[in-house]
Amino acid sequence: MTDKAGVERAVGALRAIGYYLERDRQPTHRVKAYRRAADTIAALPASEVRARRRAGTLTELAGIGPKTEAVIVEAMDGATPAYLVKLEEAAGELTSAGKRMRAALQADLHLHSEWSDGGSPIEEMARTAYRLGHKYLALTDHSPRLTVANGLSRERRLQQLEVVAELNKKLQAELDGFTILNGIEVDINEDGTLDCDTEILARLDVVVASVHSKLRMAAEPMTERMVRAIANPHVDVLGHCTGRLITGARGTRPESEFDAEVVFEACRQFGTAVEINSRPERLDPPKRLLSLAVEMDCVFSIDTDAHAPGQLDWQVYGCERAEDCGVTPERVINTWDQQELLEWTAP
C-alpha cells in the first residue's frame, strides 16, 4: 500500500468512527477527538505520517492521542480498526419503523455546516447525505441575528453561494449528479418579519423559517408572528414549530403557545410545508399537532436539522412519526425530485 493510500484509509476510518459516535449521540468531545485526528494527518505529507507511524511518534502531533493513534496504525497496516468494527457491529437500525417513508425520501432540507453552528464542512455533509441515499440536500445555515449560532452575515452568505456553486461542479461529476441547494434557516423576528433581506432570499432555493427567540410570548401575538412569516412568498418550510426540547444536554423546554389551527391553515393556504423535525431532542411537532396538520391537508418536510454527518441518519425518527400520524409520501416535499421541488419553492 502506498503512503498516500494508507493515510487516506486512516483518515476515512477516523471520520467513520466520528460518524457512528454522532449517530449514537455520544458526547461531542469524543466525536471531535476523532475528527481532529483525521484533520491533523490529512494536512500532513503522507510520507511524514508514515515516518511517524514507523518511529512511534504520532502522538507528538497535536490532536493525536493513544486511541486515535491505534486507529491510524491499524488502518495504515491495511486492517479495519478494531474500534470501527465494534461501532459498525453495534450500529444496527435506529428504529424498525418508518422504513417506507425513509425509502421515499430524496433529500434533507434542513441541515447546518461549520459555516454556522454545524461541526463539519459542507462537502462532508453532502457526501454523507449521498451515501445515505439522497439525491440532493438543502444547506440551511443560520441567518445573521442568531449570533450564538454564528449566523451568516450578508457578505458570508454571498460567499457561501459561490462556494456551493464550485462544490456542485465537483459533486455532480463525482456523485451521479448530487446537488447542494442553497438555503437558509431564517429567524422569524418578533414582529413576523424575516432576519434576511429580500434580495438574498430571492437567490435561495429553500427557505426554512423558524422561531428562535421570545419563545414564551403569549399565544395571540405568537400566532400573528408565525402567520406573517408563513405568508411571506419566500418561505417554504416552517421549522420546528413549537420550539420544544424534550431531552438532551440543553435540558427541556415547553412548547410555544399559538393557535395551531390558524397556523396550519396559513401553511395550507400559502403553500408552506410543516417541518417534521427529526432531532431526538425536538421531535417537533408533537403527534397531536402533527395529526392536526394532516387533517388540515398540509404538506410536510421531514428533516434532520443535522449539525454533523452522523446526525443525517436521524431522519428515520421523523419518518416513524410521519407514518404513525398518517402522513403519506406524496405529501412530503422531500420525496419529490429536485426539479419538482424547485418549481414548488419558486416564489
Place the predicted regions along the sequence by residue.
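Charged catalytic cores and adjacent phosphate/nucleic-acid-binding surfaces used
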Residues: T2-G6, P81, V85-A104, I122, ...
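Ser/Thr-glycine-rich phosphate-binding loops at phosphate-binding pockets of nucleotides
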Residues: L109-W115, Y136-T140
